[in-house]
Amino acid sequence: MSKPNTETISVNIPESEGVPLPDEQSVAERSIVNQSPNNSTVVTVNSEGDVSKIITRIKNHLASFNYAASLDFNKDKDHDKVLTVGEYKISRECLLHYLSGNPDFLKSSAGECSKAIQTFSNESGNLDLESLLTLSPNKDFIHDTNFYKNLYGFNVSIADFIANNNEFKKANYNTQIRILQNYHEFLKQSIEYFNKYMNQYKVIDDNLISRSYNLMYLLNVLTFRRANVGRNINELLDSYNKLNQAIATNLAIYDSINKSKLEIAPEARSSIIDKGVQDLVNSLKQRTNILKKQGETLKKNVEDINKDTSNLKRHATGDIIGIADSLRKEVDSVATSFVSTEKKK
């Protein structure tokens, strides 16, 4: 039996992410607040300066965790420039070409994923990740942890391109905005599938859960920090709730095990059987501890999101403050849910 991974996971946020927004121009002047058809409040970015600030925050976020360490699944960065889904291979540049809606942006890469895009695009023209994953002829990858490592690395690689590549910087404003909108959607789909995978297959992998948190913070940059470019800010809460549920489900499974019975030494039959049972007991205990650590990390992340809410509120007026208050109230419910789960143990 292999030795369980008992590494403690933590997600660090750079100091720059908590720095109050510059007040040379009010949030109300830089953003438009309106109502979507379902009466949910959205905030849209309406200046090139805002795009620049989004890119800066993405860059700051990438700097908050060592790039090589964050991709320790695949030490070769080039590996994560291509997402492999069964028989389909999708290059980072090709996906960005289609996300841009601009036929001239990264035109030379247009053929590096066209079959997948043509077959599995949604109404907005974005890649429908769930359809691609569930309808692909070869589904073996769905059970392969290496695929989820690749999906994580691919998302980080896209963020790295947006933050640092000159091709993105040279693109016109409308192209940049469309890429940010559609990358936001692709990132959200990726996180949802991570959570679905962990729930459906009862995955307890501290590395995968930690990577989910890293992707959540990228989503936070795009969604909450006035960079949601027309998306509902409550999507962030929805993703956190799903992540919380995935962890809580696995905790419930392990909490249902009668620990007192596990402590009882089995009657001696053979040293090999006794050792196997003891190894299993130790493994269960260690994995339970890992899950509890993830619950603590989730709670800490909720607190960090609340700090962002406070920073926004200090530099906002009118309806924006209402949004901040609403988000704080909703996000607090995640922490309350976690505490309730803890009390039931």
Swiss-Prot record:
Keywords, sorted A to Z: Coiled coil, Virion
GO terms for cellular component: virion component
Biased composition (Polar residues): 1-13
Keyword Coiled coil: yes
Compartment list: Virion
Source taxon at top rank: Viruses
Entry coiled-coil feature ranges: 283-316
Region (Disordered): 1-23
Name of this protein: Uncharacterized protein R253
Organism phylogeny: Viruses, Varidnaviria, Bamfordvirae, Nucleocytoviricota, Megaviricetes
